[in-house]
């Protein structure tokens, strides 16, 4: 028996040595009762000293291997240069199981909301920032303990099979009807002789009717307060900054939309078939604005208040205002001077879809040299837009209405749109602003102006 035990112990030692050297034919499977920490998943090898004098002692020897990467700390993603901090709104709580790429929290910045997904399948161990707390780029947000598989989705509860319905018993005999409740006083027999006193006009009820609620008569008046979100605070700050910094002045004109409507009606089907895009009016105004900005480069420039210099931009990046439930956002169409109508429509559709889904990145709204705001989609007839700093001008579009206009000495009904240009009078003179707006008017009313570069 002793010799057999020594043989088994010696064989076990050789097998264990071969296993640690990577020559074990069993691969990475461990022996019963022994947990080993060797393999590509563990960067450092944990050595074990095992007394091979008795196989029974080895049999009951155990160790616990903990991977260093089981618990990870997720940090705030890097923000753009124009964004310094944001507010955290948690979607998950401690102990919740999350799958890879599942949103754990949302960081609301001055310009947009950034979603922070889980980098792996796991369970949230700790939230390092309170709900509503302010964070900067690279701030630790939460710790996650990784698990091997995604959390199983809860199966819908099975509805139990309907039990066998028992035959309804014969209905019992209905109870005898209750005696009717007297709701009126019994009639008073009229006397044979007329009464000496005056007759009673009506019998007063024994109980007075319930009084109506005082609140219902006067009407309810209440109010409640909601904290401004960070985006609304930033919008208010920037608008007030523009009002305090810029010398804003607005000039107006009107655009005859007859030709552009006719062109759209004639080519919209072919445009949709070739580009898989609907041809709208915004692309015409964006392209016309780029054409006018090239003719009047001072409108595309900006004043650097720190150095007291005028910065002229050789590129044209046009911001298009998009209304969302959270507020107004202005994604940027870059290098518009190199685009055609199809490129502009495609970019507008992509940015608008991302804005409605709250998926705009901060980079999508950085920069911009000129802004277009279309209040006409809401039925606005007339308005004066506010400059989007640090830009120097903004174009306001409005609704299209049929109006009588004088054309060639005759009165005709034409589809007309009012347009407004608000500009920084510190940099742009009135002559340049009016010339710029007339260029836009000419390019929209007759797109051949763009082809002929007139």
Curated annotation (Swiss-Prot):
- Name any one GO molecular function: acyltransferase activity
Under the heading SUPFAM superfamilies, the entry gives: CoA-dependent acyltransferases (SSF52777), Single hybrid motif (SSF51230)
Instruction: Offer one example of a GO biological process linked to this entry.
Output: tricarboxylic acid cycle
User: At which residues is N6-lipoyllysine found?
Assistant: 111
> Which positions, given as ranges, span the membrane?
none
Q: Name one Pfam family in it.
A: Biotin_lipoyl
Pathway given for this chain reads: Amino-acid degradation; L-lysine degradation via saccharopine pathway; glutaryl-CoA from L-lysine: step 6/6; Carbohydrate metabolism; tricarboxylic acid cycle
Active site, per annotation: 425, 429
Enzyme category, top tier: transferase
Q: Which reaction(s) are listed as its catalytic activity?
A: N(6)-[(R)-dihydrolipoyl]-L-lysyl-[protein] + succinyl-CoA = N(6)-[(R)-S(8)-succinyldihydrolipoyl]-L-lysyl-[protein] + CoA
Give the modified residues of type Phosphoserine: 82
Transit peptide residues according to the UniProt entry: 1-68
Cofactor remark from the record? Binds 1 lipoyl cofactor covalently.
Q: Which residues carry this modification: N6-acetyllysine?
A: 155, 268, 273-274, 278, 308
Q: How does it assemble?
A: The 2-oxoglutarate dehydrogenase complex is composed of OGDH (2-oxoglutarate dehydrogenase; E1), DLST (dihydrolipoamide succinyltransferase; E2), DLD (dihydrolipoamide dehydrogenase; E3) and the assembly factor KGD4. It contains multiple copies of the three enzymatic components (E1, E2 and E3). In the nucleus, the 2-oxoglutarate dehydrogenase complex associates with KAT2A. Interacts with ABHD11; this interaction maintains the functional lipoylation of the 2-oxoglutarate dehydrogenase complex.
NCBIfam families per record: sucB
What is this protein for, i.e. what is its function?
A: Dihydrolipoamide succinyltransferase (E2) component of the 2-oxoglutarate dehydrogenase complex. The 2-oxoglutarate dehydrogenase complex catalyzes the overall conversion of 2-oxoglutarate to succinyl-CoA and CO(2). The 2-oxoglutarate dehydrogenase complex is mainly active in the mitochondrion. A fraction of the 2-oxoglutarate dehydrogenase complex also localizes in the nucleus and is required for lysine succinylation of histones: associates with KAT2A on chromatin and provides succinyl-CoA to histone succinyltransferase KAT2A.
Protein's UniProt name: Dihydrolipoyllysine-residue succinyltransferase component of 2-oxoglutarate dehydrogenase complex, mitochondrial
State the organism of origin.
Mus musculus (Mouse)
Lineage of producing organism: Eukaryota, Metazoa, Chordata, Craniata, Vertebrata
